[in-house]
Regions:
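Alpha-helical DNA-contacting segments of helix-turn-helix folds
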Residues: 59-65
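Basic, helix-initiating cap at the start of DNA-binding domains
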Residues: 1-26, 30-42, 55-59, 178
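A short His-aromatic
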Residues: 48-51, 55
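Key DNA-contact positions within bacterial/archaeal DNA-binding proteins
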Residues: 45
Length: 194
């Protein structure tokens, strides 16, 4: 007798959600297609129906995080107004994207350049960091931020604070709404020219 239990229909999006969790738990290199098949509850051939392989899943996952970050730089508040206000907006929104796309950004922050996809992701991350550093330099040049902290160092410290969220934040915490504001207040109250 055939089993007529309805199976969950998998989409690329639902497969990606499972994949990101497995990559974050086991690491990209430590994950096999068999691991993904087991975690998703579908056959490997079903996975291959949606994607060409594990590296394509990685590219889709880190691409989602990167698209969220680069989308911030195109927002009106990131391109119009004084540099310090644009920078504050970018910092706040970066923290918000990290919180809303936590598993995807966590994966992005863990890539090391071992594959072509990881190298691509690292290059895009460097480009994003560079654009934020340029905003910070402009705010320093305007006299809105302290000039005694080298902009490259300040940018690294900002990203260090934001990126550390992946290590301690867990979805469902009541403090989620206040995290982005706390990052902005802590960063800019410490960086503002006095």
């Amino acid at each position: 007798m055939a089993d007529h239990t309805p199976r969950t229909a998998y989409t690329v999006e639902s497969l990606l959600a499972v994949t990101v969790d497995v990559f974050n738990e086991r690491g990209y290199d430590g994950t096999s297609m068999e691991d993904l098949s087991r975690a998703a509850g579908i056959s490997k051939s079903s996975i291959y129906h949606h994607v060409r392989g594990k590296e394509e899943l990685l590219r889709l996952a880190v691409g989602r995080a990167l698209d969220g970050l680069f989308g911030i730089l195109a927002e009106p508040a990131a391109v119009q107004g004084p540099a310090v206000e644009r920078l504050e907006h970018v910092v706040r929104r970066t923290a918000e994207v990290l919180l809303t796309e936590l598993p995807y950004v966590t994966l992005l922050l863990r890539v090391r350049g071992n594959t072509a996809t990881e190298q691509w992701a690292l290059e895009r991350r460097r480009d994003f960091d560079h654009q934020v550093a340029e905003l910070l330099r402009a705010a320093v040049a305007d006299g809105a931020l302290r000039a005694d902290v080298e902009p490259r160092l300040a940018t690294r410290l900002l990203f260090g604070m934001i990126n550390s969220i992946v290590e301690w934040y867990r979805p469902g915490l009541k403090a989620a709404d206040g995290v982005a504001d706390a990052v902005v207040h802590l960063a800019f109250d410490g960086l503002r020219a006095r």
